[in-house]
Amino acid sequence: MARRAKKMASNSGDSSPEPGIKEINETWKGAIACLGVALLFLMTIGVLYWQVVEKPDTNWVLRGQVSGLVWDKKSLSFSFKSLSQDKTFARIDARHLPVRGGALLNNHCWFNTTRFCHTWDGVANLQVTLDTPNQSVAECYRVEWTPLNCQVALQDCFSMVNTSWYGGGSMRLQYWPINNANINSQPFVISDLQDTPTGYGSVLERYFLGSTGVAVRVHQEVPLHVGIESRKQLCLGIPPNAEMQPLRYTICVSDSLRSAHQQFGTVIPVVQPDQPDTSILRLPHWRSQRVADIALKLEHNLKTFTRKLKLHRLGEGIMDLGEQSTLLLSNEVDETLQSQNRYRGLRQLRLSITLSPFTSIDSHHFQTTLQEGRENLWLGLPSAANGSQGPLLMKWKGKFAVKLNISNEEAQDWFIEQVHSLQRRLEVDYVNLEVGVGSPYVGQAQHHSCRLCGDDYINQFALLAEKLGNGTTVSAATRTAHLPVFVRMVPRQSDWSHAGLKGLIPSILHYSLLGYSFFIPDVIGGSLTDGFLADEELFVRWMQIATFLPVMSFSTPPWVFGETWIVNVTRSCIHRHQTFVVPLLMKYAAEWTSLGHPVFRPLWWVSPSDPNTFTINDEFLIGDEVLVAPVTESGKVHRDIYLPGNSFQWKDMNTAQVFEGGTLLREYPVALTEVAVFIRQKSKYTPAIAEIQQATT
């Protein structure tokens, strides 16, 4: 028994596990389970945190080779950025999108890497198409917003933060850049700034350029409205309309604003254009303020004025006749053949005549066309009685008149013959055409044709002006920068404000950027004044700028101030214009016709990566070689002057001092009888400029 008990005890000990193994296994299992639960908990918390706190507000919706389009759901805005996101070309707020419900966007144009599509239900469809121009490292995007409701007002607003904007329409208060302007959103059409001072003036293009290297061009068929919120946003839009017309524009990005403008802002026609008649540049233009009610009195006034020019040794000039004086001579010449001999002395003068597409209903021309049954020469409306066309009456300079039917080839031929006939009879070469502004059918509810909507009349009238010869000047222009005609600048106030002298250089740069380098500036001292200009300092400072423009125009003769020194300064400015400036303009006119480069250039043209040049509005370049820095502040004989281009050297024409580019000259002395002019040294044009300088001495 004892031995069996001992054996059983021995067997029992052999079958039991090793001490602690079971406890250890259970501990590891519990630890692993706890760790898994903890990881799952942390992952859940992480996902929830990402969803609530860290989820990104932006996403790429379209990518090109050098740039792309980014959507920001928080601000409801799009940004065109470089792929590295170190540069923002443009930030656009889509104001028509709903304020709530912002989310990251998905591309509804499936599997299309060059197009982005998205729909905001009940609001608008968006389609953005990437387009890389041939032989270009830059990229363009065609943007199209289509409203889904006739109550939707489409509006894209481009931020002005860290971006200077240029282009668009001329303004009464002209700024360079346009960031400081403040204009309510309104139809983007040419208007008379005297009647509508907050509108857009005589030169206008649907083109905007940003200092970040971005160019925007709105498609022509868009019924565009443009507004500028000072230093905040430039807004392009379409008001609600029954047709639900889309907002279409193309935005292009490049490495600098100059390259963006050269690639996308310059429109070079297939056929190289002729230059305007540059003979008009050499002689100053004079406008007599004496009123005449008969042709003989007008002739007497002109001859008297011409004798005074010779008396003060101011040389020859072109006498600008207004429309009233032109019609006075035209009617007199028509009335009698004896006028061929009577006004022989008048024909010995150099005259510029002024005409318009308007004809008074009391005039012989209008009555004759009615008698001949040629009512179709004039714009008309269908008659309610029999459906035939009746001439459309409108006001022109206080009188009832009719307007040339520019869409009728017969009317165009008739007008051209009338102008050429008058030129032959008066023996004049230069014609100034006042076109009027706005659509002639505004306010005519029964007229549904859009042949002459917006600025179509102005555009077609400029095409007609080209047929009259390249000595023709038009009072307004759009989409015709390639034509060999001159464009007259808007009238300016006779003061030192941005509506007066301070707005002159911004206007020069604005016209040139849009392609209109051959312009006729307003008269020295401004034409929006009664009688002669009384401020002699304003007259001199204004004349110093005009010396470097295509034409010097006067309505206040220098002798009225009774100061010999003013006459002497005038004589000196005219001489400098004829011997130094005009040859320069001729040189750079060749670049305009072949490359589309502006003749008058902002400082950033030679230093596009220098932000100091983006906002300089009181200096300008002629070509790449001559920098003009006039005084535009009353009572000042010193001014700050910035010389662009770190690798350039600039020589003062007055003192022969040479300065390094990239330098700010503080309080640089500029006497009342002087204007600061600098010549770029060691450039390809330096020898030619030296020859011009030598010829002036």
UniProtKB/Swiss-Prot annotation:
Keyword Iron: no
Region (Disordered): 1-20
GO molecular function terms noted in the UniProt entry: hydrolase activity, hydrolyzing O-glycosyl compounds
Gene Ontology biological process terms, A to Z: carbohydrate metabolic process
Chief location: membrane
Tissue expression per record: Electroplax tissue, brain (200-fold less), and heart (500-fold less).
Glycosylation sites: 112, 134, 162, 386, 405, 470, 568
Topological domains annotated Cytoplasmic: 2-29
SUPFAM superfamilies on file: (Trans)glycosidases (SSF51445), Glycosyl hydrolase domain (SSF51011)
UniProt keywords, alphabetically: Disulfide bond, Glycoprotein, Membrane, Transmembrane, Transmembrane helix
Keyword DNA-binding: no
Bilayer topology term: Multi-pass membrane protein
Quaternary context: Homodimer; disulfide-linked.
PANTHER family registered for this protein in UniProt: GLYCOSIDASE FAMILY 31, SITS-BINDING PROTEIN
Protein name: SITS-binding protein
Organism name: Tetronarce californica (Pacific electric ray)
Source species taxonomy: Eukaryota, Metazoa, Chordata, Craniata, Vertebrata
